[in-house]
């Protein structure tokens, strides 16, 4: 992924314990972890701080997918409940109780799955804002009623609103 980089690399995947051990073995060197997303919102930063301590970790975050989607859509985040379906199960009853929700999603539980669960709970009249391929050339932002979400979407974040 970084063809010009000549140093040692460790590919990050679901192998978090191995990554932490590798970093610990290289503490005498400068180690950089590059990851997409918000590092402290269900991201690698949380695990690194817990493992090494905040004094040993310097986090330089970029803008999160949720922040970007809200900025592009003009949605304020002041009263928003933030969660993620990325790599975890979702409590759809809890999700349905909130008036404004932002989620980072994954291939296991994306907008269509979330919409189906909300419709089953009588929340089909809510709005869903789906940010697809955010900050890329093929970025698309969709405003749909929850009951109208039937397609699959690529690399996305979702905002669910009681009203538009």
Where are these regions (language model features)?
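General beta-strand structural signal in soluble alpha/beta enzymes
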Residues: 1, 33-35, 57-62, 82-84, ...
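Class I S-adenosyl-L-methionine
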Residues: 1-58, 67, 90, 147
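A short, acidic, amphipathic alpha-helical segment used as a generic capping/interface helix at domain edges
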Residues: 23, 89-92, 110-113
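Short, hinge-like loop/turn segments at secondary-structure boundaries
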Residues: 9-10, 74-78, 145-148
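Short, glycine-/small-residue-rich phosphate/pyrophosphate-handling segment
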Residues: 65-97, 106
